[in-house]
Amino acid sequence: MTLFFLTCLLAVFPVVSMKSPIFGPPEIDSVEGTSTSIKCYYPPTSVNRHSRKYWCRQGPKGQCITLISSNGYVSKDYEGRANLTNFPESGTFVVNVDHLIQGDSGSYKCGVGINNRGLSFDVRLRVVPGSGVLNGTQVYAEDLGGKVSISCPFTSANLPNVKSVCKQIADKHCVRVIDSAGYKEPSYEGRAKLIIQGTTQTEFFFIIDQLQVEDDGKYVCQAGDDSSGDKSNVDLHVLKPEPELVYADLGSSVRFDCALGPEVVNVAKFLCQKNKEKTCNLVANTLGQRNQTFKGRILSQNNNGVFSVDITNLRKEDAGLYLCGANSDGQPQKSRPIQAWQLFVNEETTFPSRPSVVKGVVGGSVAVLCPYNPKEVNSVKSWCRWEDTQNGGCPLLVQSTGLVKNQYEQYNGRLVLYDEPGNGTYTVILNQLTAQDAGFYWCLTNGDIHWRSTVELKIVEGQPNLKVPKTVNVELGETVQLTCHSPCKFYSYKKFWCKWTDQGCSALPSQDEGSGQAVVNCDQNSQLINLTLKQVTKGDEGWYWCGVKEGLQYKETVAVYVAVKEKGTGSGALSSVRAAPAEDVIETSVRKVDRKVVQDPRLFVDTQAKDPEDAAGGSIASADPGSSAGQGGSSKVVVSTLVPLALVLALGVLVVGVLRARHRKNVDRISIRSYRTDISMSDFENSRDFGANDNMGASPVSQETTLGGKDEFIATTENTVETEEPKKAKRSSKEEADMAYTAFLLQANNMAANIQDGPSKA
């Protein structure tokens, strides 16, 4: 059962073999008697550099027989004509074989370690005879894209007869290609012809221009159509050019330099990639056309007849054969001259990974991490914007030396490059984003081109996380505090302020680092980062950035412009200015009001119901301690009100004490829970209608109040389910005491009102 289950799994999920990181030439065509050189690449790890390198030939049973290895072994077939050299610093080894014979044709492997263990690459070697006559057959060996002129002899008896050439196919059937009567096979149209020189010559020539791979094969020249016709056999070998090997890591960059010679210096050049259908898809040409598959990842230039193409952010599908040629319309065709490259993309890469897309919001910022070769610490780092135009290009925006001058107007206060020597990366920060900033950007250095990279910036909907005022105006000599608000998710991040210039953004010292003209401090509770500029001068004018970092990696930034103005005459108001986001100021003030208890004497004095106009007018004005009327009569009102009220309260306390002592034995034990609240005397009016509650506004379920800036919450619960109809309550001594206390409060309230009316009427 288990075996059946595993079989089903293998049927649904086929085994995926890991691609070998060893790379070499897939095909080699050579002529007999010449020599060949096979170059193989391997990942330059410490283990691979010291491991055995070998060149072996595959046998009919799948075994690979070693011919030569780096351990010093050389087979009998290779003695005296082969050698193997290892280049560990570049991760390559080269096998040279001299005095090639046709018997050397076959399938081989170049590898690292032990034969048949997977760390190898398959190579096919074809050795063809040189041009000449071999066993009565004329042999021609010409390069792909070249030209061949085949001589076809015949006897004088066939001078008046038709001359023709046919090509043999697999079943030994000969298909006519061309004849002297005017016929020409379509695939040879425009590039093949017959030349018959005079009427006395016993030889005609079959000429093929722009040789193609399909032209390789056996031909028959014939003069006359019957059995008496003259025939001659021809063997044509079209030699494929050995492509230049290009070994690159996944995510890195490559460059193809196409130099086809002075004869086509003014002809349009093209670069194409061979696909599985054996057609060549255009990558780019000198006419400005580019394949959309490489959008944002390709740069090309044509200088002095050399067509250079850079491809960055390499993908697995970028591997393959690339051809460069010349054609008037810039489209790929089988032409000569031609250059070829075989690109291998190593998926077991040590190249630093990074996002190919970064997203930002309007008004926000992005931080792009760019890799460079750690061995080139002193190289000039740059950042450019890729242009999707016919001429293409990538104009520089910023370098490690500062902002590019012709970009100052568009990127003033917005762009900076942080060079971080030693860790192999540099950071580019762009803030105050707009929708027009979307596009592709390239990370460049003037060193190793393989470390170039590109990133796509997308603008999405959203709001910036950091908030500052856009502009702050301050007068000379004043002190200004810039406030930057950050969300709680940045709580553990390092916050900073810096002053932007076209040379970079210089960090300002923190409060712990010493006092100076600019001091930074951060209030973690309110998530505010404050920058204080003391005694502002004209030199303080400019852009200031607030930002956050996670470790050594920059995250988000926001910019504010400080404008310094001359001191106004007679202004003399504030000696310091505080600039903060408006919404933060509102939230802070509201929070403070909510927690503040306003003690208004009016609550304890004037509590009788009044006309709305009087309540909105005179009473509020008189209660304002800041008004002149309130200050003028405050002392008289206090004396005339508080003294009689104190006497009445003392008398009331005495009466209540006597009554309670008198009925103490009959009074039930009462547990009183105290609470604090603000009470006005009007709360005691009609107290009997409310069950003599001391606080009419209090909820029967819960009571909450704020006093002295602290919150106290008291919750009380009662049983709302009536289980038995209550009997008519018998009035107890406790109730009599409560009624007496209520009557006293009502009387005190009336006395206080009469006393207040007296001074007001006076």
From Swiss-Prot:
Residues bearing glycans: 83, 135, 291, 423, 530
Pfam families from the UniProt entry: V-set
Cysteines engaged in disulfide bonds, as pairs: 40-110, 56-64, 152-221, 258-324, 272-280, 370-443, 384-394, 484-546, 488-522, 498-505
GO cellular component, as recorded: extracellular region; plasma membrane
SMART domains, per the entry: IG, IGv
Chain ranges on the Cytoplasmic side, renumbered to this chain: 660-762
Region annotation Disordered: where it falls in the sequence: 604-634
Record flagged with keyword Membrane: yes
UniProt cross-references to SUPFAM superfamilies, sorted A to Z: Immunoglobulin
CDD domains (alphabetical): IgV_pIgR_like (cd05716)
Keywords: Cell membrane, Disulfide bond, Glycoprotein, Immunoglobulin domain, Membrane, Secreted, Signal, Transmembrane, Transmembrane helix, Transport
All ranges on the Extracellular side of the membrane: 19-636
Segment forming the signal sequence: 1-18
Post-translational modifications: N-glycosylated. Carries predominantly biantennary complex type glycans which are largely non-fucosylated. Sialylation with NeuAc is common, except for Asn-291 which carries exclusively high mannose glycans. N-glycans attached to Asn-83: Gal2GlcNAc2Man3GlcNAc2; Gal2GlcNAc2Man3GlcNAc2(Fuc); Gal1GlcNAc1Man4GlcNAc2(Fuc); Gal1GlcNAc1Man3GlcNAc2; Gal1GlcNAc1Man4GlcNAc2 and NeuAc1Gal2GlcNAc2Man3GlcNAc2. N-glycans attached to Asn-135: Gal2GlcNAc2Man3GlcNAc2; Gal1GlcNAc1Man3GlcNAc2 and NeuAc1Gal2GlcNAc2Man3GlcNAc2. N-glycans attached to Asn-291: Man5-8GlcNAc2.
Domain Ig-like V-type residue range list: 19-120, 145-238, 251-351, 363-460, 464-563
Family annotation (PANTHER family): POLYMERIC IMMUNOGLOBULIN RECEPTOR, POLYMERIC-IMMUNOGLOBULIN RECEPTOR
Subunit-level organization: Interacts (mainly via CDR1-like domain) with dimeric IgA. Interacts (mainly via CDR2-like domain) with pentameric IgM.
The record's note on its domains: The Ig-like V-type 1/D1 domain contains three complementarity determining region-like loops CDR1-3, which mediate interaction with IgA and IgM.
Protein's recorded name: Polymeric immunoglobulin receptor
